[in-house]
Amino acid sequence: KKLGVHVKKKKIKPWRFDMARNESLKLVPDDFDICVCTDLDEVLEKGWRQKLETIWDSNINRLYYQYNWSLDEQNQPIISFYSDKIHSRKNYQWTHPVHEVLTYLGPTKEELKVTDKIVLNHYPDRSKSRSSYLPLLELSVKEDPEDDRNMHYLGREYMYYGRWNDCIDTLIKHLQLNSATWKDERCASMRFIARSYKNLKRYEEAKMWLDKAIIEAPYLREPYAERVLLEYQLKNYQKVIEYGSKALEIKEHPKSYMNEPFSYDETIYDMMAISYYELGDYQKSLEYNKMALKINPNNERIQNNQIILENLIQKKN
């Protein structure tokens, strides 16, 4: 209000994100052409409006744009994917109590366009509680038990809460749905099942599910990287090197909300360096430690490992 914004208030009881967004959408005049939906913790990079007006035409219903969901201290993206909350004013409504999505209701086929020119950055409040998400996700699955996306989200949320058995049961249900056909998401469900088994110390079942995840999406680094983490925890250093090498063969980094930072940061190089050290191959260890240090030059432990390895090799020679 202090900035001159015309603020409208409405109580949504019980709280649902879809209902709140639909009430917000009703406030947009019917003669507007384009709606750009952002949250208070999201900031569009400068020049977005001019770019949008250049890209948009009357045939487009929805625009996909780059969404940097997570950024590092230098404001460089860690996890990026395409979001789709720029849309035409008419023929849309929000659905699902949480992790709400825009549902197209138009009489003709929805026309989509993708751009990398418009970028939205996410700066979340880390102190904000997520406690409302779980009951809303449970409600969402109850309302639409055949929706694969929300079944996946619910299983993932159980994992966040350390409810390992609930996570496993829910994600197996996700994989059994006829609509659950997106291999990347299926792979993520399998990884999360494996992660739950790992936390239950049922390591062979964790390995089995990671094998399934690799078969499901062999083009993704994530299942290999997850296997690296497991084998490292179990001190199976030869296996760390085996799966780490396979992970590093995959160069493509697709934009997806299921990207795991540990798949593309220094983690794999670091664990391979330590594994080579444990197996007595100091030269290889140094090689991978250098690569880890190149990605994260401020990591003191990796810096110290570099000095130790260089001294060991020097003494050996």
Identify the residue ranges that each predicted region occupies.
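Catalytic-site signature of metal-activated, phosphate-bearing donor transferases
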Residues: 19-25, 43-169, 173
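Acidic donor-binding segment of Leloir-type glycosyltransferases
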Residues: 1-14, 23, 242-249
